[in-house]
C-alpha cells in the first residue's frame, strides 16, 4: 500500500528499450504517483542492456529533479520484497 513517502515499483525486464518511456511517465506524473524507488530487474545475460538503460534512467531522474531512486538488480526476490507495484 502506498505510504506518504511514495511507492516502490519493480520493473521486470528493466533492460528493455521501452524502460526509458516508462521512467519518463513516472517522472511526469510524480505529483500524482510519487515513486520513491524504481527497481529495474533483468537476467544476468541482459547485464549490459540493464546497465545502459539504468544509467539513462538515473540521468533522466537527476535532470528532472525528482527524488526517485533507481536501483538495478538481477535478484527478483530481493527486488520484489515490499513492492507496491510490479510491471513487466
What annotation goes with each model-predicted range?
Residues 2-88:
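Metallocofactor- and cofactor-centric catalytic cores in central/energy metabolism, strongly enriched
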Amino acid at each position: 500500500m502506498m505510504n506518504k513517502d511514495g511507492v516502490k515499483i519493480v520493473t521486470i525486464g528493466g533492460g528493455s528499450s521501452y524502460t526509458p518511456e516508462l521512467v519518463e511517465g513516472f517522472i511526469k506524473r510524480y505529483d500524482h504517483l510519487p515513486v520513491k524507488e524504481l527497481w529495474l530487474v533483468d537476467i544476468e545475460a541482459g547485464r549490459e542492456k540493464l546497465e545502459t538503460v539504468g544509467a539513462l534512467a538515473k540521468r533522466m531522474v537527476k535532470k528532472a529533479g525528482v527524488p526517485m531512486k533507481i536501483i538495478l538488480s538481477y535478484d527478483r526476490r530481493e527486488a520484489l520484497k515490499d513492492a507496491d507495484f510490479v510491471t513487466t
